[in-house]
Amino acid sequence: MTDIINKLQAFADANPQSIAVRHTTDELTYQQLMDESSKLAHRLQGSKKPMILFGHMSPYMIVGMIGAIKAGCGYVPVDTSIPEDRIKMIINKVQPEFVFNTTDESFESLEGEVFTIEDIKTSQDPVIFDSQIKDNDTVYTIFTSGSTGEPKGVQIEYASLVQFTEWMLELNKSGNKQQWLNQAPFSFDLSVMAIYPCLASGGTLNLVDKNMINKPKLLNEMLTATPINIWVSTPSFMEMCLLLPTLNEEQYGSLNEFFFCGEILPHRAAKALVSRFPSATIYNTYGPTEATVAVTSIQITQEILDQYPTLPVGVERLGARLSTTDDGELVIEGQSVSLGYLKNDQKTAEVFNFDDGIRTYHTGDKAKFENGQWFIQGRIDFQIKLNGYRMELEEIETQLRQSEFVKEAIVVPVYKNDKVIHLIGAIVPTTEVTDNAEMTKNIKNDLKSRLPEYMIPRKFEWMEQLPLTSNGKIDRKKIAEVING
């Protein structure tokens, strides 16, 4: 596959009435997707700046993506869940010529001409448009959090997206014309893992509404109505869905492939999923936004579960060469690496290198290569110092999750005068806690055999489930706010 747009157009010509995108009762056929995106591309033609794509899970968000790719300008997805001040920061950074608003509400942009769905539906522009995008053009820019509070716009080139899509289709064992589930909002690059492999293989992209993120029963209704074949989500979202006893192979026999990315996949969660879907293909993948979604993969089997108490993220893919610094920081090199941060030379220079035409990115993740597999050991910036000891919070969390009394765990440092004074564990227990002191004692006894005393949390807070962000990741900030009152 050398071009995604040509692939989509060929499928639309052969299967015009096949459903390309579905969100609740809203659907678009492949013919509609290609026609509407061409009409949008005519309006964007000649623009040298990325289009702001505003909305949530409307099928017209996909129209916006394909239209912006055809026009060659690329797009910046902005989800409705993003705070207004952050949206203003993004628009100020992008300085767009055009904004495509896919919501029913008005969108006040300080920059750029605003289009609506109705504008495109009623447009008399031609439904044929020859794609203008080139391999080295920026296809999308996704903004991630910055340490200073200013979001950073990660620019991904078209050739990187095409290469990633080809890799995903090589991993995919379910074949073409499958029903794909996408959990992630489009401002989160995990969505790319579902969108382009799905459409490039003639599948139907089923979009999970934001109301389903913390309500698995609503998702159950969706899965009952639509027999999904391929599931793409964060591990945290899948864990929440496993609260449904009906989420199993007997109930959902069509669901035969899972892709996870965006977070570390806990061993306990993977074990539960393998037990419930013994015939399914389950992939654990890893990659930062700055390296086109994912750069490693491993198929999780019972053999892998038995061999590794902490799951590896697998082996590198084409377009990504992995290595570590003397400090254990993971470095990614190759085609998968981003073009840098939009209009932010200082931050780009801190973590990217483009010498001799080779792109490298310092991830900030601690990693090791062992037994032919890569392992992610947490964030370097999740290191803290307590009583003179430097430690990794994620190492403590990993050990907590191996306790028979713990289903899920997050460790929160408690500060006083900018200094960590002790640790608290936010715990989802495997059983109801009837005796707080007894449960605390049991968990601490488990930890004492695996961690030094200074790394064991002083106390534990019990939670029914860990809160998730709009991206479906564990919301560490909210947990810290709850614990610290």
From Swiss-Prot:
Functional pathway: Cell wall biogenesis; lipoteichoic acid biosynthesis
InterPro entries cross-referenced by the UniProt entry: AA_adenyl_dom, AMP-bd_C, AMP-bd_C_sf, AMP-dep_synth/lig_dom, ANL_N_sf, DltA, DltA-like
Example GO molecular function: ATP binding
GO BP terms: lipoteichoic acid biosynthetic process
Gene Ontology CC annotation, any one: cytoplasm
Enzyme nomenclature, EC number: 6.2.1.54
Keywords per UniProt: ATP-binding, Cytoplasm, Ligase, Nucleotide-binding
Enzyme kind, highest EC tier: ligase
Residues at which ATP binds: 144-145, 284-289, 365, 473
SUPFAM superfamilies: Acetyl-CoA synthetase-like
Protein location: Cytoplasm
Top-level taxon: Bacteria
The family this protein is said to belong to: Belongs to the ATP-dependent AMP-binding enzyme family. DltA subfamily.
Residues the record lists as binding D-alanine: 189, 293, 473
Annotated catalysed reactions: holo-[D-alanyl-carrier protein] + D-alanine + ATP = D-alanyl-[D-alanyl-carrier protein] + AMP + diphosphate
Name the UniProt record assigns to this protein: D-alanine--D-alanyl carrier protein ligase
Protein task: Catalyzes the first step in the D-alanylation of lipoteichoic acid (LTA), the activation of D-alanine and its transfer onto the D-alanyl carrier protein (Dcp) DltC. In an ATP-dependent two-step reaction, forms a high energy D-alanyl-AMP intermediate, followed by transfer of the D-alanyl residue as a thiol ester to the phosphopantheinyl prosthetic group of the Dcp. D-alanylation of LTA plays an important role in modulating the properties of the cell wall in Gram-positive bacteria, influencing the net charge of the cell wall.
Keyword Cytoplasm part of the UniProt annotation: yes
